[in-house]
């Protein structure tokens, strides 16, 4: 039998046991003014029209599923159900049915991320941010995260690569001004200024994906060729030394092929050979 997401991420045993024994969780009517949004909410843009539609449904049928919250700093922080909370707020209700959980930050973030990943409507960047946070929270690799979510590893990797794009491009994706395929074409530029320049063209001229790919090719061809670095004259090194140096170079090449921007430099000294690798903190 397929395991629930909560158990796959290591915090669902207690809740699953309660469900199996038929134990009903108590539903509380909490004051709207005492409830605050989830700090770990991956969804940054809410569709006002859809919230209004949900509000009308709730007005007619009521709330079928209570929201889930936890107590934090004298308030109730939403774990799951922010759209319902927004809809009820729009209706002007004073209370909302809720289940109170004892979750820590890691559990709260995981539930919020997973709940949103299971729903449609997240932008590609919001989805990528959710994947990245789950990887960081649970110390996962891309492959292990893909297995837990039932997705292909390439799907996870392609989404995460979008986080290497410049801020204006990521914002354009979240505002749905460009598609994910447009954004993936821009990845080849590996230059914030060029990405922003082409982003403006895409939006203003309504370029499709094929046209965008052609413009990327043109920009790369027009870019001034970088001057080849002067290779230092190397002394004869031992076999072990050569293996170590080549291993480092191959590792750097693999990282760069994944889409991460890495600056490297090699310096030869009298008593040692120095590799300097700089990886920008900005994702």
Curated annotation (Swiss-Prot):
Keyword list, A-Z: Cell cycle, Cell division, Cytoplasm, DNA-binding, Septation
Alphabetized GO MF terms: DNA binding
Primary location class: cytoplasm
Top-rank lineage group of the source organism: Bacteria
One protein family per Pfam: ParBc
Recorded GO CC terms: chromosome; cytoplasm; nucleoid
GO term, biological process aspect, one: positive regulation of sporulation resulting in formation of a cellular spore
Biased composition (Basic and acidic residues): 13-26
DNA-binding region positions on the chain: 143-162
Annotated stretches, region: Disordered: 1-26
CDD domains (alphabetical): SPO0J_N (cd16393)
Localization (cell): Cytoplasm, Nucleoid
Matching HAMAP family: ParB_Noc
Family: Belongs to the ParB family.
Main function: Effects nucleoid occlusion by binding relatively nonspecifically to DNA and preventing the assembly of the division machinery in the vicinity of the nucleoid, especially under conditions that disturb the cell cycle. It helps to coordinate cell division and chromosome segregation by preventing the formation of the Z ring through the nucleoid, which would cause chromosome breakage.
This protein's name: Nucleoid occlusion protein
